[in-house]
Structure formats: C-alpha cells, structure tokens
Amino acid sequence: MVSLEKNDRVMLARQLPLKSVALILAGGRGTRLKDLTNKRAKPAVHFGGKFRIIDFALSNCLNSGIRRIGVITQYQSHTLVQHIQRGWSLFSEEMNEFVDLLPAQQRMKGENWYRGTADAVTQNLDIIRRYKAEYVVILAGDHIYKQDYSRMLIDHVEKGARCTVACMPVPIKEATAFGVMAVDESDKIIDFVEKPANPPAMPGDASKALASMGIYVFDADYLYELLAADDKDDASSHDFGKDIIPKITREGMAYAHPFPLSCVQSDPQAEPYWRDVGTLEAYWKANLDLASVTPELDMYDQNWPIRTHMESLPPAKFVQDRSGSHGMTLNSLVSGGCIISGSVVVQSVLFPRVRINSFCNIDSAVLLPEVWVGRSCRLRRCVIDRACIIPEGMVIGENAEEDARRFYRSEEGIVLVTREMLRKLQVKQER
C-alpha cells in the first residue's frame, strides 16, 4: 500500500491515463433487449435522445485523459463501426491518440470467434502489445454511467494492486446477474463468484451484495501472463468474470475499487448512477428518467460532456395543425429534426427526425430515429424501433392481449415495435 500526497495524486491523474490503453468490449448481442438488437450490437443501441450506449464508455475515456482506445467488436458490428468512424475521429494520430476497431478475425490458430470476454482480448494481444501501455483498462461497452478512470488508476497504484475491479452495492435480488465479491478492510478481494444463484450479502446489510461492474484495471504485463495461461487451459470458458478474476482472487492479487470514489456526478449527495439497461424495461425506464424534472443522470454537466456523432439537423418544431390543435410536450426530450403537429407528447423521448402527425397522444414512449406516427394514434409505455411507420389510428400500450399478439410485450408491460413486426401485421391484415 502506497500513501500518496495531494500533489502526487494530481500529478498521477495526468500521467497514469497517458500510460494506459482502454479496451472496450463491444461485441455483445444483448439478447434480453429482444428484437431491438436483431440488427445491431447492444453498444450501438440508441440511448438518451441522441446518443449510442457506447458513447458513455468512450466519453469517459476521453474525459479521463485516456486517448488510446481499442474497441473490440463481433456481433452485428456494422452500425457500431459506422458510428465510431463518423463520430469519434477527433483523436490526433501525431499525438499517439486513436480509437482502434478490433473486429473478430480469427487471428489465432483454430477457427474460433471470441469464446469469451478474456478470449476477445487474447485474440488481439498482438495488436495490444504494440501500444506499449503500462496499464490496461478493460471496459464494457454496454453500460450507462459517468466515471473518471484516472481516479481508479490512482487507487490501483496506491494499493499496489496487479488487478483492480470496480464494484458497487446492488439489491440482493439483482445480484444473480453479476459477479459478487467479498472484500477485507483493505479492499482486497477475498472471494469472488460469477452470477451466483444465492448471492452472499454484504456484511451489515443483508439486502445488498457487492457486485462487479465489469470494469477492470490491470498491470499490462500481468494481464498478458494471465491471458497466455488462460488460453492454454482447456477447462476455461475464457471469461474475465468466470475464470480470470476468480483465479486472481485465489492468488491474492485482486483489489476492489468502490465506484463512488470515481463516479462523476453534479450532486455529491446523489446515489452513484450506473445502469446495465440490459432488459427492455430497464432500457425504457432509463431513457424516460432523462426526461424527468430531476433525472438521476446529469446529461447537462459541461465539465463531463457525453460526445456522439452530430448530424446537421434543423431544430425541433411544434406546430398548430389546420384544426387548431397545438403540438405540445411535457417533461420530454425532443431531438433535432422532430416535428410534432397538433399532438401531445408527455414523459417521452423522441430521437432525431421523428414525425408525429395530428391528434396523437404519446405518453411514456421511446421513439427511435426516423419514426413516423400517423394521425390519431395513441402510444403508451412502448419502445418504437428506428424508421417504423405507425399507421393512422393505431393504439399501442392499452390492450395487453392485443399488444402481445401484434408485437413483443414484456412481463412488465413494455411494448417493443419493430419494422418487421409491422410488416408481418400488415401481411396478416391483407389476407
């Protein structure tokens, strides 16, 4: 354990990111989001009115001072690659800054694609070694949060760790979806179980468990050794949570980093914000929260901007139709290029170029880019996928049986509508 003075911390906050490379694991399909990820990887899914999910990890890197980034892709990567090429070409090659796209290419012997999260890094080691980084920051590309990775790097150095795992308390009922750990008084991880059926509770709070966030800092040389050994282990599933972290824990080399120490938030008293948005309900709820009066995630913090690909779009427009009805919104996010004509939009998120025609009522809905809503529609508690054309007079979110028959309806009552579902519905109606 190294004790650092304030001046040392300030200096390290500048130096450590320059000695680091971030690897963003962005190849996941996100099957729990159902048809929303049929044609795009989960990190490429739209979020928050104008962003993609991966923009949060990329923005955290940029704001933390990490300007050497590798994005590891696999499933349905075209949309993701296109987004990064268009929106993240701001780095200077002359200053050794970059975002490298690392698609699965079966570089190593055999015909395997990425077998797990650790294998995704292993198969790119020939490229990663060329970065000559002292530290490797492993990130998931499908979470919504704001974090200063330089603070986590300082914690890693101060504790003398070879591996540091970001963690936060989660409700015990939700902990089955995470790696769960136990730590001692120095934050050394003394036990780690990936997605346990019966998660162990935190000492002093039986309602919560200490969960891994899938954010890791490694000494680079130590990581390379671990991955080389793991690649030769036929019994391994080649996954950080299932194999690598438990092994390091047994060797006494892993330390925990409490997320509140590096979480970036405008209100110091607020609960640290981190969302998986892995289910349709979580995705819908996290989007709508941004439209509330006091959202849990501050998207307006100029000191920690979330960047994305910016299209040249006209301002949103609210117009009065010929009948005299006004286009109105309440507690909603409305992006550029949207037109609301003689309709009411309440507690909803409208992505760019959404068109809502007259006499519609939109309530608690997430409308992705280029959605067109015909006249006299009522949409409630739903997610409408990109470029869907909602026919005139359609009602969604009011009749559970009808919604389940026509579209996908979650157990919580959130309705997902895609172009393919609408096409099939039209074919049925024409028969």
From Swiss-Prot:
Q: Which chain regions cross the lipid bilayer?
A: none
Please tell me where beta-D-fructose 1,6-bisphosphate binds in this chain: 39, 419-423, 429-431
Q: Where is this site: Could play a key role in the communication between the regulatory and the substrate sites?
A: 74, 113
Gene3D superfamilies on file:
Hexapeptide repeat proteins, Spore Coat Polysaccharide Biosynthesis Protein SpsA, Chain A
The molecular function terms of the Gene Ontology recorded here are:
ATP binding; glucose-1-phosphate adenylyltransferase activity
UniProt note on regulation of activity: Allosterically activated by fructose-1,6-bisphosphate (F16BP) and inhibited by AMP.
- What SUPFAM superfamilies would the database entry show? Nucleotide-diphospho-sugar transferases (SSF53448), Trimeric LpxA-like enzymes (SSF51161)
Q: What does this protein do?
A: Involved in the biosynthesis of ADP-glucose, a building block required for the elongation reactions to produce glycogen. Catalyzes the reaction between ATP and alpha-D-glucose 1-phosphate (G1P) to produce pyrophosphate and ADP-Glc.
From the Swiss-Prot or TrEMBL record, give the protein name.
Glucose-1-phosphate adenylyltransferase
Source organism per entry reads Salmonella paratyphi B (strain ATCC BAA-1250 / SPB7)
